[in-house]
């Protein structure tokens, strides 16, 4: 009988340690994801450390050639539409307005890539000043204190619960780690995709009222993608400060408590470990919608 009790005790302890180890692997994945995020969160997409910008620049030049023709076309369309009544609308003041708009549009196309680089550098510097390491996930000793006070068959149920809890918690943390890295990397991809279309979009400003909506939509989209990383940095900063000093459930494992109470407390500790990860990931993945609603950038 003592042999069975010893076997049950060791088996339950092994399951608990396995759950703790698996949860620790999830925490290690989160830490690794945090290092990757810290490396790229303040990177300027136009810097040489990120591949693809040379291709984007070449495509911008190619689309600029198309935009020159479109600028002339939109200018003529806008002129004709706003000068139907020649006697009333065809004035010197309107002519100056048309040509000033045409010149500004042309300059925006020519120097647009430089302006884009300057804006991205500004946002990179701003983000670098805000960025902070992500909240850590630790599973050290999360299951100890309960199993040490149990023997025999009573170790099986909490051991199994701890194993399942560790696996589920690690899976949640792993998925969140992948999502938070994708949120940072997808921003670079979206910026690289829309930058070459800037000349074509900006050329619509030459047409004036009724035609410049395309250019306005491009600017709003670009600013949304650009400022998204600032919201991500703020979310990481706030989550680290908030969850780093707050105990959500106030759980405490003690030998004076029954194994049932301790088991519930340990499971709550797992939830307390996973909750900051979920909250941080939700804030990061929703950064784009937050910045669009905050600044009215919805197209």
Residue ranges of model-derived segments:
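Hydrophobic transmembrane alpha-helix segments characteristic of membrane transport
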Residues: 70-104, 197-212
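Non-cytosolic segments of integral membrane proteins
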Residues: 15, 19, 26-29, 33, ...
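Membrane-helix interfacial "entry" motifs
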Residues: 6, 50-61, 86-98, 158, ...
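Binding/recognition "hotspot" determinant
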Residues: 1-70
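Alpha-helical transmembrane segments
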Residues: 202-220, 290-297
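Alpha-helical transmembrane segments and their helix-start/interface "positive-inside/aromatic belt" motifs
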Residues: 7-19, 91-108, 215-228
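Hydrophobic alpha-helical transmembrane segments
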Residues: 64-77, 168, 173
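Loop-to-transmembrane-helix entry motif
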Residues: 59-66, 102-106, 178, 185, ...
């Amino acid at each position: 009988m003592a042999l069975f009790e010893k076997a049950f005790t060791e088996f339950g302890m092994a399951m608990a340690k396995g759950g703790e180890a698996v949860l620790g692997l999830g925490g290690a994945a989160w830490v690794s994801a945090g290092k990757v995020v810290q490396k790229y969160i303040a990177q300027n997409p136009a810097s040489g450390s990120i591949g693809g910008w040379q291709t984007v620049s070449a495509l911008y030049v190619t689309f600029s050639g198309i935009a020159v023709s479109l600028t002339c076309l939109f200018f003529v369309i806008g002129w004709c539409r706003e000068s139907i009544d020649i006697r009333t609308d065809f004035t010197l003041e309107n002519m100056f307005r048309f040509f000033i708009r045409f010149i500004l549009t042309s300059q925006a196309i020519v120097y647009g890539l430089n302006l884009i680089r300057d804006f991205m550098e500004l946002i990179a510097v701003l983000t670098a000043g805000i960025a902070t390491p992500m909240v850590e996930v630790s599973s050290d000793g999360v299951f100890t204190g309960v199993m040490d006070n149990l023997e025999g068959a009573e170790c099986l149920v909490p051991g199994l619960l701890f194993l399942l809890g560790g696996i589920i918690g690690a899976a949640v943390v792993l998925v969140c780690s992948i999502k938070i890295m994708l949120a940072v990397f997808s921003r670079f991809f979206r910026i690289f995709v829309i930058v070459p279309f800037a000349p074509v979009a900006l050329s619509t400003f030459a047409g004036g009222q009724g035609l410049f909506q395309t250019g306005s939509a491009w600017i709003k989209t670009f600013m949304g993608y650009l400022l998204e990383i600032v919201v991500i940095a703020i979310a990481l900063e706030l989550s680290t400060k908030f969850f780093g000093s707050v105990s959500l459930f106030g759980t405490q494992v003690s030998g004076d408590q029954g194994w049932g109470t301790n088991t519930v407390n340990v499971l709550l500790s797992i939830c307390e470990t996973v909750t900051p990860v979920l909250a941080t990931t939700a804030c990061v993945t929703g950064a784009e919608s937050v910045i669009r609603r905050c600044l009215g950038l919805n197209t």
